Amino acid sequence: MQTWGEVPSDFRGCSATRAEAYAQTQTLIWQMQEKTWLARHPLGTSSMHQANILDAVRERAGRRRGGVAVFDHLRPRQTAHIVIDLQNGFMGHGQLAEVPMARAIVPNVNRISAALREAGGVVVYLQHTIDEEAIRTWPVYFEHFCGPEHRARMIEAFAPGSPGHSLWPELDVAQQDLVVIKRRFGAFVPGSADLHARLQQRGIDTLIISGTLSQVCCDSTARDAMMMNYKVFFITDSCATLTDAEHGGTLSAMAHTFCDVRDTQSVLDLIAATR
């Protein structure tokens, strides 16, 4: 079977000119297909998740604490907006780890960052990073959860300095914001990042979680943060993953035990209420 971009067998052994012509034709076809896809699915306009907390979880939360909401206020100067893995490798069309719905959350992420920054809070961008240290210290993941081909492509995509490792250009990153390397899914486990130390230096006790993927890095970071005694808000429409089912499952798990789960406008209202 011919694979994409491979010269068919009847072209092999032909003159270089004929083979090159075939390759050029295939490239033009791919470019036309890409333009058609982008016209139908413009970057930054992917659909938002249609998912929410399970009714059973809402009922249990109501019995435990009176409702899904956990906190009735926040103090912006003690709060950090943690923006997780919104990098080209997760955001760009056709990228290895593309999460189309992650493009749709960027306006909400920027709104939260702007409001918190203006109110005196901290904005942190975490970058999923695969470098020599990550590979050396986390062999269980790289050797058992990734096949050889996928592992090689992920290393290439998220190596420091690679295009995929860079933050998505539509994010409104300010000069005072922090950009932190993250070598595990969760940002607080040993060997992942120096996030906890940086937050403690700034007197941060509350986190707002945004980013991708909802059920992997956002989930892992939020769970560990709560168990390290941070107050955690998990934002329904500024986190994204590949399917509504995965997103909804994460919201339910977070709301059950770990986080105050609410939407962008609700957390913006909490920030505004402090002024």
Predicted regions and their residues:
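Structural recognition of the beta-strand scaffold that forms the well-ordered cores
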Residues: 83, 124-125, 179
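Short beta-strand segments at enzyme active-site cores
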Residues: 121-128, 134, 235
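A short alpha/beta connector and helix-capping loop motif
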Residues: 77, 95-116, 121-125
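Active-site-adjacent betaalpha module
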Residues: 2-3, 11-80, 114, 118-119, ...
